[in-house]
A protein has these predicted regions:
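Signature of exported/secreted
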Residues: 25-322
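Sec/Tat signal peptide C-region and signal peptidase I cleavage site
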Residues: 19-24
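Bacterial N-terminal signal peptides that target proteins for export
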Residues: 1-10
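Bacterial N-terminal signal peptides
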Residues: 9-17
Length: 322
């Protein structure tokens, strides 16, 4: 499994250290939440999603992208075929450039890979890779021309390789559904485990990641509702600080050979990933999801120091037709 927050290589049913809050120890019987996958074939939902990103480096730069699409799960010989289609984007009135980009985004979104998942919900593979790659290739040729595309084809072949497309498709599924399958968690108890993942600013550098997760409460699947048919899952992870410092120091030791880079260094680097998922415990059908990543640090260049940060948040709201 490889959730967006970091590459989790064990399920939540692995040997994790559970730390029960004092309140749980002092009160009555334990409330165990049993998370099981049971999406029925024929599941259909509209999903509203928004991505917000703010980058601060002397000045602040923000980006907000919203979309609305259909999620559908159909029966498949190996389990379920999960597809994403009928993408809709906010109209850009009076802005031809923005309208053109919206058209491109709609075409690209229409080629989002379909997933094949096993009856137990585990991710198996993406469906029909060849047609996805052909469609993306055709779209880029139209945008850039054959000559411009020729210069980029090698890079795009890497980006659009079956392995790359599989990783991208699996990340979201595993973060929201896959990593929670068959976990039995005490309500209010905090669980911890350690894994390894690449640093956001140094993707070739792998460091230990520490994680905590819990079932916070039983809540309504509908925001503001009075029922308690769903649960709130909370997951936070961050890299081991000592390992980060060592990795950064070693990285910058290799930079003096690059002209102008010998006086640049990171004095601090902090990373925090967080997921909040409101889901049905008996089916793992999500209703509300928020996934965020904060990367911040202090960069030193000669005698000057500057703070840099990037905050990225994705939200999803699901409305089920059946």
């Amino acid at each position: 499994m490889k959730p967006q927050v970091f590459a989790a290589t064990c399920a939540l049913t692995c040997a994790c250290a559970a730390i029960a809050p004092a309140s749980a120890q002092e009160t009555g019987p334990v409330d165990t939440v049993r998370l099981r996958f049971a999406w029925p074939a024929g599941t259909v939902a509209r999903v509203q999603t928004t991505r917000f990103r703010e980058t601060i480096n002397e000045t602040a730069d923000t980006m907000v992208v919203s979309a609305d699409y259909r999620l559908q799960a159909d029966s498949h010989p190996e389990g379920l075929l999960v597809s994403y289609d009928d993408f809709r984007f906010p109209s850009a009135v009076g802005d031809s450039a923005a309208s053109a980009m919206e058209t491109v985004a709609q075409r690209a979104a229409a080629m989002v890979p379909k997933l094949i998942v096993a009856p137990d919900g585990s991710f198996l593979r993406i469906h029909d890779v060849a047609s996805i790659r052909a469609g993306l290739d055709s779209m880029f040729v139209e945008l850039m021309g054959e000559d411009g595309m020729a210069a980029m084809r090698e890079m795009l072949n890497t980006v659009m390789s079956e392995d790359a497309l599989t990783v991208m498709a699996a990340e979201e599924w595993n973060a929201i559904v896959g990593m929670w399958i068959d976990a039995d968690l005490e309500l209010g108890a905090v669980y911890q485990y350690e894994d390894q993942a690449p640093l956001p600013v140094l993707p070739d550098v792998v460091v230990p990641m520490l994680a905590e997760f819990m079932v916070e409460d039983r809540t309504s699947c509908v925001e503001g509702g009075s029922d308690t048919d769903c649960v709130t899952l909370h997951f936070v992870s961050w890299p081991d600080p000592d390992s980060v410092n060592v990795a950064i120091r070693r990285f910058f030791e290799t930079l003096p050979a690059i002209p102008g880079a010998d006086n640049i260094s990171f004095e601090e680097l902090d990373v925090e990933n967080e997921m909040i998922i409101v889901t049905e415990p008996g089916t793992l059908r999500p209703h509300r999801v928020q996934i965020s990543k904060l990367v911040s640090g202090v960069v030193k260049a000669g005698d000057e120091r500057g703070e840099v940060s990037q905050f990225d948040v994705r939200t999803y709201h699901y409305t089920y037709a059946r």
